[in-house]
Amino acid sequence: MARDNGNKDRDGKRPNGGRNRKMKRKICSFCMEKSESIDYKDINKLRKYVTERGKILPRRISGNCAKHQRELTIAIKRARNIALLPFTTE
C-alpha cells in the first residue's frame, strides 16, 4: 500500500519550493508600551484590532499576548455597549 504524504505535490516536491519558512513572532504592542490597562475610550487604538465588518481580530493575527487580548476584548465590548464602536457595519 502506498503511503500518502499530504505535504507533497504529485511530482514529489514541496508546495512552497522546498523552503522551510519560520514565521516571525509578533510582539504584543501593549507589552512594548508597558501600558497598565487598555482604555475603552481610546477609539483609535481599539479600531486597529477590529475588522471592517466589526469582528475582533484573533490573537494570532493581532500579535497580542493572552493577557492583553482578554483586556482588549473587554474594552471593545464596553465601547460597543456605549456606542463608541459599532457592533457591525453594513
Swiss-Prot record:
Summary of the function given for this chain in its UniProt record: Binds as a heterodimer with protein bS6 to the central domain of the 16S rRNA, where it helps stabilize the platform of the 30S subunit.
Q: Which species?
A: Clostridium acetobutylicum (strain ATCC 824 / DSM 792 / JCM 1419 / IAM 19013 / LMG 5710 / NBRC 13948 / NRRL B-527 / VKM B-1787 / 2291 / W)
Hey, which family's this protein in? Answer: Belongs to the bacterial ribosomal protein bS18 family.
User: What is any one of the record's Gene Ontology cellular component terms?
Assistant: cytosolic small ribosomal subunit
Q: What is this protein called?
A: Small ribosomal subunit protein bS18
Q: Which Gene3D superfamilies match?
A: Ribosomal protein S18
Q: Which UniProt keywords apply?
A: Ribonucleoprotein, Ribosomal protein, RNA-binding, rRNA-binding
The UniProt entry, under PROSITE patterns, shows: RIBOSOMAL_S18
Q: Which SUPFAM superfamilies match?
A: Ribosomal protein S18 (SSF46911)
Here the segments flagged for biased composition (Basic and acidic residues) are: 1-14
Disordered, as annotated region: 1-23
Q: Single Gene Ontology BP term?
A: translation
Query: What residue intervals traverse the membrane?
Result: none
Molecular function terms in GO for this entry? Answer: small ribosomal subunit rRNA binding; structural constituent of ribosome
Question: Self-association or partners: how does it assemble?
Answer: Part of the 30S ribosomal subunit. Forms a tight heterodimer with protein bS6.
InterPro entries, alphabetized: Ribosomal_bS18, Ribosomal_bS18_CS, Ribosomal_bS18_sf
